[in-house]
Amino acid sequence: VRTEDGKELDKDGTPTFKAFPEGKVDWYTDAGFLRYSANCLACHGPDGLGSTYAPSLVDALKTLSYGDFLSTVAGGKKNVSASQDLVMPALGTNKNVMCYIDAIYVYLRARADGAVGRGRPENQDPKPAAYSKAEDECMG
């Protein structure tokens, strides 16, 4: 794991979390919780555990690659069966999601790996300057 502009990256360059003792986390994990709660919770349920009409993202992130996660969020997904028609809208143009997609992924990855429990994690790190700059550029 390496840190680049305040963001933790795994050996493949995929954003990842940094857990500290006593349940505290890095900025991205905490920000991801907030953005997930604002944009994803209504369908995928509290803490990423799923609902009657959207899957558990905690379970999905155990096997879903970063690229597949980005593709699904940006392009949407449709699963049709004899009993139900499940549709996730494409969110690729939603700045409230896409400007924070790495933070959302990091939070869900920490949940999937069991590093973060239910509820809001305690923040440890200050907001990285690079995060603020990227946020300002993305949101316009």
List the model feature ranges, each with a label.
Residues L64-T72, D85, V116, S132-D136:
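Short alpha-helix boundary/capping motifs
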Residues V25, T29, F33, K62, ...:
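Solvent-exposed, acidic/flexible segments
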Residues V1-R35:
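Electrostatic cytochrome c docking/interface patches
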Residues D30-L41, G50-S51, L64-D68, P121-N123:
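Sequence context surrounding c-type heme c attachment/ligation sites in exported
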Residues S51-V58, G76-A103, L108-A129:
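Axial heme c-ligation environment in periplasmic c-type cytochrome domains
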Residues Y36-P46, F69, V73, M88, ...:
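The canonical Cys-X-X-Cys-His
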Residues D125-G140:
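Short, low-complexity, Pro/Ser/Thr/Gly-rich segments in the mature regions of secreted, periplasmic
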Residues T16-D26, G50-L61:
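Short charge-dense sequence patches
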